[in-house]
Amino acid sequence: MLLPQPKSTAKKPKGEAKSLVARERKSQPQDSALMEVPAKREMPKKEVKKIRSVHKVESVTKTKSAKLRRKKSYSLSSDNESKYKKSISPAASEEASIEKKKEEMTSKLPEKSVAMKTANSPKTFNMELAKKFFEMRMKESQRTSRMATKSDSSLETMPESSHNSGQSSKSRKSQRTRGKSTPLDRNIFKENGEPVWVVPDRKPGELVMNEHGEMVKYPELMAALEEDGLEMEDGKGWFQKMSSYLMGELDQGRIDNKAASKDINPFASMETLEERTDLYFSRETVIYNTTDSIFNLCHNAIERFSQQNNEDTIRKSVPPSREPGSKMMTVSKDEEEKTAIVTSIRFDARAYRISYDRRRPVHSIQKFRKKYQKQLKKSQEEKKDDTKTAKNEGD
């Protein structure tokens, strides 16, 4: 900002002030702008006369107040003009000093600076400072991006398919570590060839010494039965029990199932329930129930076995098998006279095909009906022709 020297009090014509403003606007360089503040004009002083009358004093006070108002309004208008408009240029004698100062200011400005002018406030833009600022911002952004990549690399992510496809077959085979698999023969079967679940290591049917000194085939089963208070008997002894069952000697262990099912009460006392279990699982009841089940299931087999042993019973003779063609048809004489000798036989071997379209079911059914009606007409006409020919031949 440059402030010009105060003007002289002498008045100058208006035309000269306008011409000076136009010259200064042309002479100002484009690279810089100057703000000029106008100097206050001093009006010539007037002689004040002393007024003695009252009426004249009032008129003087009114004129003074009016002058003060004018001065205030003028000062406000001058301030507004200095803010928003260019002021009037100084006198012509001071133009040389102002131009020198302008040249000095332009020489001090850097070469790369550019003047950015606006209507209200002119400013200069420094390119070097701007470059430095943007370089610093770029470096900071690069640092932040690197830090973000480092933090992301620590995360566990699934590899893409392209990375896996690049591996060689040898590296894949080396990564696969399989344990040694034992053969099935060792896992499932023993050395003697028997499966693992066969616990006793002995031949089937071989006798083994029991704890009581008895030779038994199944010692494990005997031990399990002894725990439950049961005995294992030989199967051949059941033949005698079957005969005693038929004679009615085992009726002591018989229980009426209908009466027992009516009296069952699951919420009864423990004493009654224990009595019921003793009754059902006693030795006599178990023998009776087993013989009863054997008799009912094997009744037909027992009858066949008894028939084989008895020599008196003769087996029913089964008639020999005959061929179906060997049977002779007995035909009466009347039927032979009525029936004519068959000379020709006709076989109808026409194939009848039906096509059905699921997309158009109604259309396919209509086609089928048309075909069926046509074939019926043909068959009826053929039958009529056959009957006519048969009548002609008979005549």
Curated annotation (Swiss-Prot):
Highest taxon above the source species: Eukaryota
Compositionally biased spans, kind Basic residues: 64-73, 170-179, 365-377
Region (Disordered): 1-121, 136-187, 308-335, 365-395
Polar residues: bias regions: 144-164
Basic and acidic residues bias (residue ranges): 13-28, 97-111, 378-395
Signal peptide feature range: none
Protein name: Uncharacterized protein C09F5.7
Organism the protein comes from: Caenorhabditis elegans
Source taxonomy: Eukaryota, Metazoa, Ecdysozoa, Nematoda, Chromadorea
